[in-house]
Amino acid sequence: MGAVKLYKYLDFNGGLMMLHYSNLQFTNATQLNDPFDCHPSLIDFSNVPKEACGGWTPEIIEELRRDPFRRTREEVWICSLSKIYDSILMWSYYSKHKGICIGLDMEKVRKYLSRMQGGIMIGCAEVEVQYKDIVEKPDYFRDAKDFFHYQLSTKAKAWEHEQEVRLFILDPWPTYMSLLPGQNDDKGPIDWKEVRAFPEIVGECFE
């Protein structure tokens, strides 16, 4: 069972849009503020044992093992929430302390994100972020870990004040995708990873 109540920090306009449209914004993992977030480099793939090579070079095996994690980062959209509503640092990130912090009843959010909408199951997973010294990387070939969970849930200790819990969706359905104000294709095609996902919830989820 996850947290009962979580909080979303936004700038003023983002908060108004979230309440008006009753949705949550999910951002592709490659577009998050921390360049190391969900990055395959959180895991050490370099110590390839000889028996894993099977006639291939260690470099090829290293790339083959890393590639699924690279694809995961490109295919997952994340909604970052917090367990706290009174962090000065968090407030400072949004409009110079003039943003909005919206409470979410997570029991209701989970209910509405685990339903059919237009014949499509929205569905999302939830994970509490763990903060670690990311210089010390787990060894892919020698450590027994759920490395995909590690990739999606691990951040540097410098971010520990965020007390983040994240929701994530893999390859969100195009119906939920929308451009942000100011995003357009005047300068050429927009990278799909720059487009946000906005699955709907309902007003009763907000507190």
Residue ranges and their predicted role:
Residues 1-207:
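Partner-binding and oligomerization surfaces adjacent to conserved cores of proteins
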